[in-house]
Amino acid sequence: MDGGQPVPSPLVPLGNGSDYSMSLEQKTTFVFVILLFIFLGILIVRCFRILLDPYRSMPTSTWADGLEGLEKGQFDHALA
């Protein structure tokens, strides 16, 4: 096609590979993406733990705590 010469690519540095170093913006972006992947992993693990055992994360109080002074079993009179 073009005489057998390689086509330059923006992803592959030309010349020696040891001359290529990441810029500050690329390093910052790389660290930010890694932190996002770590955060995503933590959220995935937390969601799977909630799906496997949903009642473990609930408080131990009962529904009757909100009746304010009424004993358990007397809710029929409170509704009337």
Curated annotation (Swiss-Prot):
Stretches that traverse the bilayer: 28-48
UniProt keyword Transmembrane helix present: yes
Location of this chain's protein in the cell: Membrane
Gene Ontology CC annotation, any one: membrane
Main location: membrane
Swiss-Prot/TrEMBL keywords: Membrane, Transmembrane, Transmembrane helix
Keyword field contains Protease: no
Mode of membrane association: Single-pass membrane protein
UniProt record similarity statement: Belongs to the cortexin family.
Protein name, per record: Cortexin-3
Gene coding for it: Ctxn3
